[in-house]
Amino acid sequence: MHKAILNSDLIATKAGDVTVYNYDGETREYISTSNEYLAVGVGIPACSCLDAPGTHKAGYAICRSADFNSWEYVPDHRGETVYSTKTGESKEIKAPGDYPENTTTIAPLSPYDKWDGEKWVTDTEAQHSAAVDAAEAQRQSLIDAAMASISLIQLKLQAGRKLTQAETTRLNAVLDYIDAVTATDTSTAPDVIWPELPEA
């Protein structure tokens, strides 16, 4: 096999084989080495060059420089998870390069954590406010369940029917329970102690 002779534009002036180093068209990351036969007037394949990349270094990808004139080592964090310092959302890194801006490798400990520039700090006011909102929703759920448990008794009352002693006792117990649930202090959330629904 004859070796190809190329001009300054990397076009073959004499047909033959040439070793090229291929890279990804988007990330410019080194992919492989191949031997190509070039006929006269044919250039090297797209996304390839003639200069060999350096040896592999742990934690780095070998990529073509932005001007395509040389190889460079680019940090390779692929497979790592980073967290947005704005929202706390996680994202897996899928391309070579530095960590994206406004991210950290430190995971937030709660949905209420805010980044202070160095670490996550829990926004206790937001956390407490969310706990109070959840307690208020729990209050309404308990009241709804209690009301559902006496719906037949309410229907009898609306129809003007007389209640048995057991039904009257049950109705009063559930109404007392609803009063107790309504009076429960949710400002201590998430440590709210709810009253027990009376047995049917």
Swiss-Prot record:
InterPro entries according to UniProt: Phage_T4_Gp38_tail_assem, TFA_Chaperone
Pfam annotation, one family: Caudo_TAP
Q: Which domain of life is it from?
A: Bacteria
The family annotation for this protein states:
Belongs to the tfa family.
Protein's UniProt name? Prophage tail fiber assembly protein homolog TfaE
Q: Which organism is it from?
A: Escherichia coli (strain K12)
Q: What is the lineage of its organism?
A: Bacteria, Pseudomonadati, Pseudomonadota, Gammaproteobacteria, Enterobacterales
Question: Gene name, please?
Answer: tfaE
